[in-house]
Every structure is written in C-alpha cells, then in structure tokens.
Amino acid sequence: MDLQPDDQELHRWPTLSEALEEIKAIGKISGPTTITGLLLYSRAMISMLFLGYLGELELAGGSLSIGFANITGYSVISGLAMGMEPICGQAYGAKQWKLLGLTLQRTVLLLLSTSIPISFMWLNMKRILLWCGQDQEISSVAHTFILFSIPDLFFLSLLHPLRIYLRTQNVTLPLTYCSAISVLLHVPINFLLVVHFKMGIAGVAIAMVWTNLNLFLLLSSFVYFSSVYKDSWVCPSMDCLRGWSSLLALAIPTCISVCLEWWWYEFMIMLCGLLANPKATISSMGILIQTTSLVYVFPSALSLGVSTRVGNELGANRPAKARISMIVSLVCAVALGLAAMLFTTLMRHQWGRFFTTDTEILDLTAIALPIAGLCELGNCPQTTGCGVLRGSARPTIGANINLGSFYLVGMPVAILMGFVAKMGFAGLWLGLLAAQASCALLMLYVLCNTDWMVQVERARELTRTCTMSSTPLPISSTISESNTKKSNNKANLEEVLCVSDEPVKSISLETDPLISTTTS
C-alpha cells in the first residue's frame, strides 16, 4: 500500500531521472498511438484519392458528406466513447478488473443507442442539405455516400470502446499492428470496389466501412486469443443497464468538448465561403485543415497517453506521480508546439505545392501557415491538458474551457479580423489563434491550481478495495447494503458508480472551479 506523500512532494519539480522514467512510461502508450493515428490519417487520404479519381463532382459530394458525418455523427460517437476513459483508467490503477468489462459493455450499449437517431438523420441528409441551400447535384452524390456509410456508425460503436479498453490497460502495440493491416487492405478494397466493380462513390463509402470492420475483427481476435479479457470479463446481463449515471456524467461533457472543437473547423470553412473568391479560400482552408489534422496526431497521442497515466496513478493512490505525469507531458507538449511552429514557418512556400499549383491558393496558404503554426503552440498544451482532465475525471472543465475559448473568444475575433478589419483569410486564422491561446492559458491555470490530494480522494471514493480480494463484485447491491459495506471499508468502484454518486459529486464541486453546479 502506497504511503501518503507529504506536502513538499506534491509541490516540487520532478528530478531528471523521474522525468525520464515518466517520458518512457508515456512514450510506451503515446508512441504506438502516434503510429496508429498516422496510419488512420493515411487511410483517410487514400479515400480522398479515390474520390478524386472518380471526378470533381464525386470529390465535392464525398467531402461534403464526410463533413456532415463528422459534425452529426463521428464527433458524437468519439466524444461519448471517451467518457469511459477515466473510469477504466482509475479502475485499472485500483485493480478493479471487473469494472473494466462492465464499463466496456455499457459504453457499447450507449454508442449503439446513440447511433440509431443519427442514422435516421443521415437518411434525411439530402433534404437537410437542400434546406441549407446546397447544390442539388452535389447533395445527391453526398446522400449516396452517407447512405452507404451508415453501418460505419455501428462498427465504430464497437471499435471506439474496445480501443479505449485496451489503451487504459497500457495495451497499444496490438492496435498499431491491427491498424497497419487494415490500412494495407484498404487500398485493394478500394481498387476492387471502385475500379473493378465500378461502384463509384458508393464503393469508396463501403471501403471505409469495410476497413473499420476489419480493424474491429482483428482487435477482437487479439483480445480473445491473447486472453487479455479474462480478468475483466463479465458475462452480459441486466447489470449492463445499471450504473449509467456516472458514465453519462463523464461522457456527455467529454462529447460536448470534442464536438465544440470539431465543429469550429467546419464553421471556419463556412466563413471562407463569405470571403472574396470563396473557391480559393475554401481550397486553401481545406489544405490547412488537412495539415493541422496531420500535426494534431502528435499532441492527440500525447493527450491519450497522459490521460491513461494520470488515471492509473490516481486509481493506484499515487498523486505525486500523477502530478509528475502532468508536468512532463506539458513540457513535451510545448516542445511539440515549437516543432510544429518551426515546420509550418519553414515550409510555408513549399507545403501547398503538394496539393495544388494554383498561384492564388498557394499565396493564401503561405500567408496562413505561420499563423497555423502559432496556433499549434497553444493547441498542443491545451490538447494535453484535456488529457489530464479526462484522466482525473474532470471533463466538464474541458467542455467549459472549449466553449468559452472557441465560441466566446475565437469566433468574435475571427469575424472581427476577417470581415470588419478586412484581413480576410488571415483574419479567420487569427481568430483560431486567439481561441487556442485563451484555451491553453485557461487550461494551464486549472492544472497549476489542481489539488492532487483532493483528486486522489475523489479517485479513492471510486476505488475503495474490498478487504477480501475474493469478494464478488456487488453489482446488484441495494442502497442500504452499499452504505453498510462502505462503512465496513468493503465498498468498491462498482458500488459507487452503480448506487451513489454523491461523494464524488460533492468533492468535484470543491475542486472544479469551472464546473457549473447544474452539470456536476
């Protein structure tokens, strides 16, 4: 059992050996996750290449459909799935194995339930696009693409929770291997459907769905044959339908936070359409968003790594190590931001040539790329900070920060600089810079004022281990039975999640200054 750290231990900087040890621990998770992210990015590029092969109309329709799917579906599924991350991370640190399996099952049910109304929305996509004033021909092509993408919602509802389930147990390399195999198969699948069978844009959509299905089947096979599931396996039962309050309390604000950031970039594209020469500005914005998506792979992987580390350490009652994880990851994030800024500045005249030869688009891209690099100087620390907040089960703070930074600061600045100050395309990116800067500053303020002893107390409320290791998980305990067991120090994480959330809520109100009392 870990001894409680003294006050000095929680306020000192880590030694060089501690920092190197933590870098190694984070790198063990973030390294394979980065490779996986790059592989999945290349898969998206392959799909875009095949859309371009089909023609300008198919490329426009497919791009519009993917943007619509991101806003209304993929961002929601991804955000809700991340709600299970702090529960699984802290459960793994506290050796509450069975809760891992239960949380996996509950999250799958949550995502499958969410996919149903999203599917109905996608079925009516053409009507929605026409109501928004989109071109009839492009809307028809986009509608065809998204109809064949509907099964992807259900496969992602299985895939996202499975990936988080493995990552919170520090199992990341198998995901990289499985992603590599699925991406390698993605090219021949596209060739078979698009070129050989001449299925057109429907073939590209089916290929994307097929690739996600392959990835899920490969990961499921690994989980089964490696027996990684045995300690956490819980037979599906009605217990999956209980204890949803804590999962939803984490999933909903995480989803809001993810959606707010994803939607901002779609909003930027809409604003580009209002500028002079919208074709050039929209094309340049597309190039820059693809570039920032590529750069984002690295801070995103770091964020996922530190989220797992912080959750594991808090669950294991080691607040000092959780704090070291935060410090080391933020230093790494600043280094990533500086590297991104240097890259975009040096490559501002060459990078756009990989995508186009149009002089006007190249000029706009060269002007905005250094600003995009400055944005990454704020984006990398704030993305990493979001990982720390997720690992310590405080996603509502992240949602509040994103709302305030992107929509109360960034949006007005973008409109002011782009249209009122007549700075045009560069002015829109200055709005994003203002959003990222304010987001990073608020995130750093919250993290620097975190009381790690209080955070470990919050985690302990979820991770009180039973006095007897053989005690079965009391999933069906009544409220009175739960209170009795807690008084005898036999409560565990599942009791707290299923029966009573009040201890966790009361502590979160004391330590989360940006949480509104209505959402906590």
Predicted regions located by residue number:
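Transmembrane helical elements of multi-pass membrane transporters/channels
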Residues: K28-S47, F148, T211-L215, L219, ...
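Alpha-helical transmembrane segments of multipass membrane proteins
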Residues: M45-L49, F120, R127, P161-Y165, ...
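Helix-terminus/linker motif at the lipid-water interface of multi-pass membrane proteins
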Residues: Y41-A60, L129-G133, L192-M199, C255, ...
